[in-house]
Amino acid sequence: TSDRIVDVTHPTGDLVAQHYLPTTADVETAVAAAWAVRAEAATTSAAKRAAALMHVSNQLQARHEEVARIITDEGGKPLMWSRVEVSRAVSTFRWAAEEARRFSGELQRIDTDAQSEGRIGVIRRFPLGPVLGVAPFNFPLNLVAHKVAPAIAVGAPIIIKPANKTPISALILGEILSETDLPT
């Protein structure tokens, strides 16, 4: 971890939190860790991925007001809109949980001419490697959710870089994800 500290401040100027900026070595460690769990993440069952995603959705719902207030504190968004953002993230994780069960392959007929009569093609979908997500400040939870949830749904490790000025809601999401059985 670097010695460069970033202040997270409310638009009123009140200090909300502080965090360290990552070093190049921190980023390299994260990338190496993501590649190291790639095979395990890709072979994690759809049921297990869906359960983890539902856990996140349920925990965000249970902590709805707390997370909304954090979004307001860290970014100055009106509380009403922060609540909407948390609701959207809850829905995003729920949708991803449903999609995790549908992420599979398919069979297609490829008998388009006489030489291929009776043949089928197998289409198999699988993650190619880790995903890197960079999230902006204006929707610090929902736009992180839109990157993290689909990556988990398909079995891809993800490294997320939240905005420096609004990282707390992403950290809460990481905390909730750490409660699951997903590979880390």
Model-inferred region functions:
Residues 1-19, 51, 55, 87, ...:
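Terminal low-complexity tails and localization/encapsulation signals of metabolic enzymes
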Residues 4, 37, 75-77, 99, ...:
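Glycine-rich, flexible loop/turn motifs
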Residues 5-7, 68, 175, 179:
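A general secondary-structure boundary signal
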Residues 6-7, 28, 70, 83, ...:
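N-terminal hydrophobic or amphipathic segments with adjacent small-residue motifs
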Residues 7, 23-26, 40, 111, ...:
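Serine/threonine-rich low-complexity intrinsically disordered regions
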Residues 13-104:
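Glycine-rich loop-to-alpha-helix module at the N-terminal edge of alpha/beta enzyme cores
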Residues 108-184:
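Rossmann-like NAD(P) dinucleotide-binding subdomain of oxidoreductase/dehydrogenase enzymes
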